Amino acid sequence: MSDGRIIQEICGRLDRGETDRDQFFDQLTRTVADMIGCTRCGVWVFVDTAEGRALRCMAMYDRRLDRIVGAADIYNADSGPYFETLVQEGCVVASDARHHPATVGFLDNYLLPLDLHSLLDVCFSINGVPFGSFSCEQAGAALNWTQRQVQMLRHVGSRASLALLHAATATPDTQPAALWEPSSPNRLLTMPAPLDPDDENERRRDPT
């Protein structure tokens, strides 16, 4: 089964009520970690808090522990360069996260304690408005992220956008923030797109 079909099946199980939101996020982050080949994978959503706008972690899968782990909110006020890059460019590609201008601020409190060397964060949108991001993290040694990996995360966000909205808004303390207008030039498309070159062909062969 192709990556695209796997993502569709995970979303379909949530839509049919066969899994709950926690199981959905667990399955999704594990699958994306396998697709990208990274140590950790998380799903975050933009929220408004008493301390200002932030990214809140819905789930963070850590391959080293083979389970979901906790992650603190990331606040715009504390992480200006990171937020600015993520919003303006739609992604943060930091193969050397310990020295990248957008992520060096995480060095002492996040990167060093978790032995993380590389970060790849890519926004996903709902109805044209940035809603959250996928984060991929590499521990032990640096990993040179590729454009293909960036595109894979964007396609996952496009394909899973409605399921992500459903799962994220099922959390009582999560009120998603509409941070930017749909006309923003860095908005991402939310229409489904193939993850692999042959994904569309497979769908045509098997319409179910």
Language-model features, listed with the residues they occupy:
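Signal-transmission linkers at sensory-effector interfaces
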Residues: 1-27, 34, 148, 166-206
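GAF sensory/regulatory domain recognition
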Residues: 30, 42-74, 78-79
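Regulatory sensory and allosteric helical modules in signal-transduction proteins
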Residues: 64-102, 106-112, 117
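Short hydrophobic/aromatic beta-strand element in the GNAT-like acyltransferase core
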Residues: 108, 121, 133
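A short, aliphatic-rich beta-strand micro-motif
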Residues: 117-125
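Short hydrophobic/glycine-rich mini-motifs in sensory/regulatory modules
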Residues: 124-134
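Amphipathic alpha-helical "output/dimerization" segments
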Residues: 126, 144-165
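Short beta-strand-to-loop transition segments that serve as allosteric relay/switch motifs
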Residues: 132-143
